[in-house]
Amino acid sequence: MQRYISLSVSLSLLSGANALVRPDGVGRLPALGWNTWNAFGCDIDASKVLTAAEETINLGLKDAGYEYINIDDCWSVKSGRDPNTKRIIPDSAKFPDGISGVASKIHDLGLKVGIYSSAGTETCAGYPASLGYEKIDAESFAEWGIDYLKYDNCGVPTNWTDTYTHCVPDNSNGSKFPNGTCPDISNPAPTAYDWSSSNTAQRYNAMRDALLGVNRTILYSLCEWGQADVNTWGNGTGNSWRTTGDITPDWSRIVEIANENSFLMNYADFWGYPDPDMLEVGNGNLTLEENRAHFALWAAMKSPLIIGTALDSINEEHLAILKNKPLLSFHQDPVIGRPAYPYKWGYNPDWTFDPAHPAEYWSGPSSTLGGTLVLMFNSEDSAKHRTAVWSEIPELKDSAEKGSGYRVTEIWTGEDLGCVKDQYDVELQSHDIAALVVGESC
């Protein structure tokens, strides 16, 4: 039996000891940007990418901190590489001026540009990928002006698969994971196996080394779905690393991923962040409350916040969520790298692994908010009360005696709730989340 992460693990473990530190602070804080995939899949072209870049400015998202405009899969000629140079060839029907032409226009707007490849022979959509061509592709990306690489895990040949299987309790790998364990896993690794020596780690390290060898700083986003215990080596390889299979704009999938990622917060700090996948805010049939909870949890976990909706048709409510100043301020804290941690599970006993009901009570210190970030989440399917008790919150409990009061601000509305004694109770609609800044004592 393998356990995803010890459910009694202390959330005070050191992280970042072997972090990938890049010039100019690139990758020190979790990325903010936009990506083509969730909105358009393979149906991409220069016009859609440039429209997103322009709307990032027009809608105030650039001013809010979003800076990367990322091109996902399907940007190249599908038939193969240039027979002479061995370079990947941008699809001229989609990108008449090449990737470099799009990158130049995005840079002229004061933004950065990202590209996609995979650590295999083909991308997930069947386009040429980078395994064995890491140096050539890194050089191409640098010459084109690329600032960000999302590196997927498709097209892996059999000689590059891992000897052992790591437990990732995600629905893409089955459905039976009692409290975060994988009792049915085939070929588990021996105790104390060093996953940094695995074939998966070697494939991703090869591209890391290629990127480090070019004369351009390129943020490196690993997309290998939590395999090969990436949490133990991802911070020395890339700036973020995916922890699960792909997200979808379905509430059940969003809370499943939130649950999985919540057990990995000890790995998040400056220069390295577990990545629960791109945002679905504005997509599918998610309610306003679900969009709000999705964003708040991702921001509190200091996940990369990569928008995945069409910006030229986004509504004001969804845009306001993506631009929420207090949550973005917490997310981009230049002094405190650690994310918010769950301090009470609420619906379940503490440390319960439940894909439908993640931890409901979160808190985190902040140097930018003038207090502690506190989240209360209703994971249930009907309206429920949730109560934040000051003496239960780790950042407050040493000073929160009976009768203690704190000045509290509600994050979604900006309302000053005044001096709140002992606790704060709120009724939340199904799947909604309350977000507070608990400030000075009063």
Curated annotation (Swiss-Prot):
Cystines in this chain: C42-C74, C124-C154
EC class (word): hydrolase
Q: Which Gene3D superfamilies match?
A: Aldolase class I (3.20.20.70), Golgi alpha-mannosidase II (2.60.40.1180)
The principal localisation class reads secreted
| Sugar-modified residues | N159, N173, N179, N215, N235, N285
* Annotated active site: D152 (nucleophile), D246 (proton donor)
EC number(s) in its UniProt entry?
3.2.1.22
> Which subcellular locations apply to this protein?
Secreted
Q: Among the record's GO biological process terms, what is one?
A: carbohydrate metabolic process
Q: Name one GO cellular component term.
A: extracellular region
Q: Highest taxon of the source?
A: Eukaryota
Q: Which UniProt keywords apply?
A: Disulfide bond, Glycoprotein, Glycosidase, Hydrolase, Secreted, Signal
Does the UniProt entry include the keyword Cell division? no
Q: Name one Pfam family in it.
A: Melibiase_C
Amino-acid positions noted as binding substrate in the UniProt annotation, renumbered to this chain: E224, W225, G226, Q227, A228
- The signal peptide annotation in the UniProt record is 1-19
Q: Spell out the molecular function terms from Gene Ontology.
A: alpha-galactosidase activity
Q: What does this protein do?
A: Hydrolyzes a variety of simple alpha-D-galactoside as well as more complex molecules such as oligosaccharides and polysaccharides.
Q: Which family does it belong to?
A: Belongs to the glycosyl hydrolase 27 family.
Q: What is this protein called?
A: Probable alpha-galactosidase B
Q: Which organism is it from?
A: Aspergillus oryzae (strain ATCC 42149 / RIB 40) (Yellow koji mold)
* Gene name linked to the record: aglB
